[in-house]
Swiss-Prot record:
Coiled coil: none
Region of interest (Alpha), ranges: 29-60
SUPFAM superfamilies membership: Metallothionein
KW Glycoprotein (keyword) present: no
Organism lineage string: Eukaryota, Metazoa, Chordata, Craniata, Vertebrata
Binding site for a divalent metal cation 2: C6, C12, C14, C25
Positions contributing to a divalent metal cation 4 binding: C32, C33, C43, C47
PANTHER family listed in its UniProt record: METALLOTHIONEIN, METALLOTHIONEIN-1X
Name under which the protein is recorded: Metallothionein B
Molecular functions per Gene Ontology: metal ion binding
InterPro entries reported for this sequence: Metalthion_dom_sf, Metalthion_dom_sf_vert, Metalthion_vert, Metalthion_vert_metal_BS
Source organism of the structure: Chaenocephalus aceratus (Blackfin icefish)
């Protein structure tokens, strides 16, 4: 299980159910969350997106 960190409003659960509501996370370890764009490359370490854009720091 690899939960998302939501420090702002909204709830993220990237466990088995994988549900995100009003996701405002700044770091999301699963690409199933809407705060990680669909075009974001999936890496072995998981997708880490800053904000709602996918840049060079998306996967690290």
């Amino acid at each position: 299980m690899d939960p998302c960190e939501c420090t702002k409003s909204g709830t993220c659960n990237c466990g088995g159910s994988c549900t995100c509501t009003n996701c405002s996370c700044t770091s999301c370890k699963k690409s199933c969350c809407p705060c990680c764009p669909s075009g974001c490359t999936k890496c072995a370490s998981g997708c880490v997106c800053k904000g709602k854009t996918c840049d060079t720091s998306c996967c690290q």
